[in-house]
């Protein structure tokens, strides 16, 4: 009897997860054992296989690397932590957090609590500033770690999340002189400036917390369900604010996605409108009568791929905007279906037309449109929101897609690999809201 009681206590100390998540693969005819094996295979591709992007450092740290760019980014580090907590991989989670805290997180100064968005794999910073989606994922992953493992196993996860939440509140700072050579980021700012993760007027997430980047946003940074997690379990006294941020993000996504294609721009204004091409002093000006060059960030491209999956996440975890989200899911799948389930490319203008050559964002030294598995993954994940029969074709396409180099040698183990893993987690019912253990 005592043994059974101890087992019951141990079971209670493990996490209970949200019960709503469906196993769409099984619903569409795949066998549960097949799905479990495939999910394990895709996880191992990212963390343990020959093309892995996760690397351990010593006895206690590790990092996720964007291999093709030879760096570690807050994007990948925080994604890795979110994946680790979902899979119950505490050692991986703790290693990634220790590396992030040691090398990326500012421990003092104007940016205290924020994370340098890019570091060399030895920890040397490539940049000091933050990219706001990293903080978004770090906070949420830490809260889930607290909910899953408690705060007495070596890291006080909730305290770490609360520290970041306190540091991202609006504040004034005086910018340090900036090195020359970065005209695309605007002129040097003078005098007191504002820093914040969430724009205090619109309640929308910034592209970057400071500098020119806090004047606009990135639609792929909008994950309303994460704010709901903060409201429930951050215990930082700001629950009403986070609920408001969730609602404002949902309203923003209505504006930022095309009413016919469902596509969105990589970056846009807080009202969902297009970015205007900045013309800083010293940059070439258009000649008289010359049509201004289109700002390529107004196109659907790499960052944008994440939006279908982010909206899917909110649909699954919250359901607060389910009717619109179902319509969105079918709109965007209808568009890609019209392009060919096995043929659609990875960059478009929001109206569905193809970008001109100079608008195509290069990756890995190639300026080329591709049928990328990262986008295949996120469009397939949107099937969770959809009722039409087309969804099965997208799910089957993801299941059968091979993550391997293109004929010209291009291969993205990092971004494509992580989005592929997230999609398999979603469609197998294994990307869930983690509630506190009892």
For the regions a language model picked out, list residue spans one by one:
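Internal amphipathic alpha-helical repeat/solenoid segments
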Residues: 38-76, 84-127
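Sec/Tat signal peptide C-region and signal peptidase I cleavage site
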Residues: 15-19
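Sec-dependent N-terminal signal peptides
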Residues: 4-13
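Terminal, non-catalytic domain-edge segments
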Residues: 20-29, 310, 382-438
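Short glycine/serine- and small hydrophobic-enriched flexible loop segments
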Residues: 81-88, 137-148, 225-232, 309-316, ...
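Extended ligand-binding clefts on enzyme/binding-domain cores
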Residues: 20-41, 48, 67-74, 109-114, ...
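Aromatic-rich carbohydrate-recognition surfaces in CAZymes
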Residues: 70-77, 124-149
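Solenoid-repeat scaffolds in large eukaryotic assemblies
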Residues: 80, 92-93, 154, 161, ...
């Amino acid at each position: 009897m005592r043994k059974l009681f101890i087992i019951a206590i141990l079971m209670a100390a493990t996490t209970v997860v949200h019960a709503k998540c469906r196993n769409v693969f099984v619903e569409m005819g795949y066998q549960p054992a097949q799905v479990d094996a495939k999910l394990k295979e895709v996880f191992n591709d990212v963390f343990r296989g020959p093309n892995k992007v996760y690397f351990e450092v010593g006895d206690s740290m590790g990092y996720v690397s964007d291999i093709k760019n030879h760096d570690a980014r807050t994007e990948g580090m925080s994604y890795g932590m979110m994946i680790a907590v979902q899979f119950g991989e505490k050692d991986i989670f703790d290693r990634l957090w220790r590396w992030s805290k040691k090398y990326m997180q500012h421990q003092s100064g104007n940016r205290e609590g924020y994370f340098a968005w890019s570091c060399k794999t030895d920890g040397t910073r490539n940049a000091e500033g933050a990219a706001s989606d990293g903080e978004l994922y770090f906070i949420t992953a830490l809260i889930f770690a607290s909910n899953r493992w408690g705060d007495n196993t070596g890291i006080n996860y909730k305290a770490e999340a609360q520290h970041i939440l306190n540091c991202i509140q609006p504040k004034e700072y005086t910018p340090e002189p900036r090195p020359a050579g970065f005209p695309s980021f605007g002129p040097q700012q003078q005098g007191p400036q504002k820093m914040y993760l969430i724009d205090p007027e619109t309640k929308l997430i910034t592209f970057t917390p400071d500098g020119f980047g806090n004047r606009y946003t990135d639609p792929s940074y909008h994950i309303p369900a994460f704010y709901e997690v903060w409201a429930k379990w951050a215990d930082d006294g700001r629950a009403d604010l986070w609920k408001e941020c969730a609602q404002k993000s949902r309203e923003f996504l209505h504006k930022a996605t095309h009413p016919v294609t469902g596509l969105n721009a990589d970056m846009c204004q807080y009202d969902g409108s297009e970015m205007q091409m900045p013309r800083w002093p010293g940059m070439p000006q258009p000649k008289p009568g010359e049509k201004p060059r289109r700002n390529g960030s107004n196109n659907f491209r790499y960052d944008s791929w994440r939006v279908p999956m982010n909206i899917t996440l909110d649909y699954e975890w919250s359901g607060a905007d389910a009717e619109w989200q179902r319509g969105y899911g079918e709109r965007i799948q209808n568009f890609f279906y019209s392009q060919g389930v096995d043929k659609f490319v990875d960059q478009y203008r929001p109206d569905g037309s193809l970008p001109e050559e100079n608008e195509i964002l290069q990756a890995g030294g190639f300026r080329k449109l591709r049928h990328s598995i990262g986008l295949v993954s996120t469009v397939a994940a949107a099937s969770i929101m959809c009722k039409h029969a087309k969804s099965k074709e997208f799910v089957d396409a993801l299941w059968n897609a091979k993550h391997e180099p293109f004929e010209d040698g291009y291969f993205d183990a990092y971004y494509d690999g992580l989005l592929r893993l997230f999609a398999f987690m979603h469609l197998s019912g294994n990307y869930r809201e983690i509630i506190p253990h009892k």
